[in-house]
From Swiss-Prot:
One cellular-component annotation, GO: proton-transporting ATP synthase complex
Similarity annotation: Belongs to the ATPase C chain family.
Species for this entry: Helicobacter pylori (strain Shi470)
Function of the protein: F(1)F(0) ATP synthase produces ATP from ADP in the presence of a proton or sodium gradient. F-type ATPases consist of two structural domains, F(1) containing the extramembraneous catalytic core and F(0) containing the membrane proton channel, linked together by a central stalk and a peripheral stalk. During catalysis, ATP synthesis in the catalytic domain of F(1) is coupled via a rotary mechanism of the central stalk subunits to proton translocation.
Entry protein name: ATP synthase subunit c
Gene3D superfamilies: F1F0 ATP synthase subunit C
Site (Reversibly protonated during proton transport): E84
Membrane topology: Multi-pass membrane protein
Length: 105
């Protein structure tokens, strides 16, 4: 965890390195991109954990009672779609924050 924190802090320094001629609009663009990347990374990480837990629970339920495997599989696919939808919503929000930022106009 300490390595990841140090890595992101070092990455932010490289991302915002400039020669002093950067205006306010460029700084807003940089922060928008950094915020979008961090938000999308957190959403993808949380979605992956949720999908793993859903798959593990479905496999455990099917192993305990093979007769309801079909119903559990259907429920798992619905849960996977809902989890993935949250990640896609975050991606759409990140794209909107980057390309049509209201603070840049």
């Amino acid at each position: 965890m300490k390595f990841l924190s140090l890595f992101f802090l070092a990455l932010a320094g490289v991302a915002f390195a400039h020669d002093g001629g950067m205006g306010g609009m460029d700084m807003i663009k940089s922060y928008s991109i950094l915020g979008a990347m961090i938000g999308l990374g957190i959403a993808a990480f949380g979605g992956a954990i949720g999908m793993g837990n859903a798959a593990a629970a479905t496999i455990t339920g099917t192993a305990r009672n093979p007769g309801v495997g079909g119903k559990l599989l259907t429920t798992m696919f619905v849960a996977m779609a809902m989890i993935e939808a949250q990640v896609i919503y975050t991606l759409v929000f990140a794209i909107i924050a980057i390309y049509s930022n209201p603070f840049l106009s």
